[in-house]
């Protein structure tokens, strides 16, 4: 009797795991990205070079790659949107496309958006997060490290202009 009960209990437990295993797996997204200075006419640059400190009237560019759980690039056929949300609440929609965008043949494809820092914007660190939305309206958010020295920072001064 005891061995039959144990066998029945084991069968029920195994069937319970089989049912749980057939559930849809959670689809996770993975984010890669950086911040660079976006070119603005008559500014000297350097452009498309990693930095986290920007002066007013310079343009911050976010370069973002989103990967699916299989490690494949999640482009605009996989994601409905990618949005950068600044710490002050501004939302900047990113676009998927080739880079460089003009001139030379593309070397890469990723999501990007740029924002020109207003002349009167306060100095200091400015947090942000990146929100990817899948076609089924599922959102996933990524945020950089929260230590002030590694955050996007607006610093005093004017951008250098070409002479």
List where the protein language model places each region.
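Short flexible loop/turn segments that cap and initiate beta-strands
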Residues: 54, 58, 66-97, 128
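Exposed beta-strand face motif in extracellular beta-rich ectodomains
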Residues: 124-130
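Beta-strand-rich domain onsets/edges
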Residues: 23-61, 65-68, 158-163
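Aromatic sugar-binding surface patches on proteins
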Residues: 103-116, 122
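Short beta-strand elements
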Residues: 138-163
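Bacterial N-terminal signal peptides that target proteins for export
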Residues: 1-9
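Sec/Tat signal peptide C-region and signal peptidase I cleavage site
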Residues: 17-23
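Bacterial N-terminal signal peptides
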Residues: 8-17
